[in-house]
Amino acid sequence: KEIKYIEIVPQNGRYTMSIVYNNDLEISPNQSTDWISIDLGINNLCSITSNKFVPVLLNGKPIKSINQKFNKRIASCQKKLKSNDKKSSKKIRSLYSKRGDKLHSEMHKISSFIVDLIKDQNIGTVVVGYNPEWKQRCSLGKKNNQKFVQIPYMKLINQLQYKLLEQGIELIIQEESYTSKCSFMDKEPCCKQQTYKGNREKRGLFITSKGVKINADVNGSLNIFKKAIKNLEQVVQDELISIPLNTGLVMNPLRVTLRTDLSQIDQRSILLKIKINTPMVFNV
């Protein structure tokens, strides 16, 4: 393969080398009209909805656990440095690097699992939500700021982007404002409203104007998809939006935890479980 360029970047007392090469594979665009939509969060790292299978919630607690483990060790080192009026040390820089490496590895496992799911289900359209406040760190609250900033969402999105291109699929990145507040079931436009049709009664639960209970992250994921297809050609838009609005909505998400030691056999069993859990629907 022809090397395009090599990049060497100093980072936390060490050097990281990236090699970028040209991929000469001839890739045909995926023509499938089936779709998935991904909402990124904290406790549910990825909330995946589709017209092919029940919603899948990827557990985000293992990522939180990694951050908490390293944050505790970093805080302990920083406390010892205070007496010497120092703010950093070789050990602290090493901990930051190790945390980054660990999260980078976990994001690869998660993105690879999602791509395998997409290939397994022959999905042609993939949408992921994006929140500019992940970088701006505004109006999320002190605790949420820290949690969101320490989860490398853009790394996950970038990995999905290039892995999907190899499958002939272009990832649609959709700004996600108001997708968690507006009711997908009530066909409410995803924009600021004087009065919202639905509401979040408690954490993880969204209730529509008709009193229908739905997982809050599932509602957000479907709204992200609804916002994204407005930017597509009208013919494609009509074909895609007719699927979720006409068939109804799945009520019981399938919760999946990707262990650090997940084997190929374990992954295939999870994909099979998703495949046999076809949507249980009700009329809107």
Predicted segment positions?
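Substrate-contacting helices/loops that form the catalytic groove of nucleic-acid
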Residues: 3-5, 11-157, 235-284
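Positively charged, low-complexity nucleic-acid-binding target-recognition regions
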Residues: 145-147, 151-284
